[in-house]
């Protein structure tokens, strides 16, 4: 895992963040990782190429919120997402994330406790995912 600190966003990181937020918000979200001391963006490589990224916001010394997590479509199913969660869980015993229906099973398989937040946006059910290391 590598901390992403470049002042300009690379095409690979731009693409990954766009999977987790709208295209219009990519630059704004990336800037938060550069400017805010409680936010960190990590990338992971597979076969020499950036294959995924995970961005967190530190809530306390023992808790963080996953703000973005994404893996390139061609690299999915290879354990890259789990590797990123393992890395974050090694640093923070308590992790929270908010996600949609498409990603909720990923968190559930990892051992997150899932709570429906209902329709936060018209037609879009959101879920709160909470993980506490035993």
Residue ranges and their predicted role:
Residues 1-28, 45:
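Short amphipathic alpha-helix that is part of the acyltransferase structural core
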Residues 45-47, 131-133:
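Active-site beta-strand termini and strand-to-loop segments that position acidic
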Residues 82, 101-125:
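Conserved active-site alpha-helix within GNAT-family acetyltransferase domains
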Residues 75-87:
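Conserved acetyl-CoA pyrophosphate-binding loop and the N-cap/start of the following alpha-helix
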Residues 90-102:
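Conserved GNAT acetyl-CoA-binding A-motif
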Residues 43, 49-58, 62-70:
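Conserved beta-strand in the GNAT
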Residues 32-43, 65:
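A short helix-loop-beta-strand connector motif used in the catalytic cores of GNAT acetyltransferases and
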